[in-house]
Amino acid sequence: MRQLFAILFGIALAVTPTAARAQDAPDQKLAPAALPSADRPFGTLREQSAMQHAWLKKRLDTFLPPLMRTHGVDMWIVPMREYNEDPVFSSITAPETFYARRRTIYVFFDKCAAANTAVSAACIERIALGGTSQGGVFTERRSMKPIAAATGARQAELWGDEQWMALKQVIEERKPKVIAINRSKTFAFTDGLSSGELQGMGETLGATWTSKFRDAEELPLNLIASRLPEEEAFFEKMTALVWQMTQTMFSGNVIVPGTTRTSDLVWWWRQRTNDQGLGTWFQPSVSVQRKGMKSDQLGDDPVIQPGDVLHCDVGITVARLNTDTQHNAYVLRPGETDAPAGLKRALANANAMQDFAMEETRPGRTGNEILGAVLTRMKGRNITGTMYSHPIGMHGHGAGPLIGLWDYQDGVPGRGDAKVVPSMWYSVELQATTPVPEWDNQPVQMAQEEDMIIGADGKTRWALKRQDQLFLVGAKQ
């Protein structure tokens, strides 16, 4: 199969000699334009690809040099094999690269570190031993093995032990003092080095170089977490679409009280995201709270009725970025034009928790410190609830410090001890439980989740806005 591919690839090159190489930056001159669509909110895949290529280069130019210098690392080695990619993979590769190529070894070297000169993008060498240049972001090292001319294939790819020998040569040429590897007991995002790859490196490099290995946990963690202003602007558009979709879902355009089930809304969301060319990173959920009934009485898939409080947990994925949102709605009873005051007060308590979270989240603080500060302020306001926020971006549950878990409100050892950094995003996820007089003081949970941006200046803001009014199902449009 590989030989057949090589032959076909050679024929393709003969027919279209200017064709762009697979996984490299797209050539805008080639291939017909995508079919027109009135429902493609983020443009064509080709347009998204060009944008992502620009983001990739700028992210590596902007964030990686100071991170390597801050963490005292002059070389960072990231080896992986096809279908067993390191979690940092999507943060350092182009959008056309879905998996590692056979074995791919990415090497980053700070050539200015020895002289202790000011760090800049020009200081960092980016080398790919296997795979491609990712649109010119990396310098490729290929094999010297000759290839039979009859195949029409390009220069051979590195393979097997040859890759480790090539890595050893790269290291010996540069003589790094500290070599970062992705190994961690605490963070999944920084534990991408497999046992087999570590063994393979060790056998070839020997103690001379393996003695310089360091588990630099925060280097990949913070690189994955860091976002550009250009990505912030795109994320705002993603969030605006999520708001539009939740408002439509929680309306009379979709819900027929007495007929529509919660599962109907779940699959409406899945279908709507798919129809718009979007992805999602988790199965959405929709739940109901009802006066005089407990959740186990409602069942797993209740029919929505007038007077219900509705809640959704939804997200979309576009251009490798993810959203995570929870909104709430009230189904009007006949003759009602608004939700009961007690339900609005319950939402206001959740809003107060959001205020606390936004005000207490700032660079340099750990997730556990932020959690403690928020819980203290909740106690001062007599608000009952829980806080369980997480970073978001390249992953839905993203890289960085957790701010609580729903079942760990005393702090999260390890994962809550990392520090917030500038230019990262959070899903501010929480719930406030409030007795509602109109429901005979039955406790009602208002669970909310809105995405928040921490700018390069350390200031926080909502990616778009936060919900401070219940959506009303049955209200006149």
Spans of model-derived segments:
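Positively charged n-region of N-terminal signal peptides that target proteins for export
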Residues: 1-4
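Bacterial N-terminal signal peptides
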Residues: 6-16
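Sec/Tat signal peptide C-region and signal peptidase I cleavage site
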Residues: 18-22
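Active-site neighborhoods and metal-handling regions in enzymes and metal-associated proteins
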Residues: 23-477
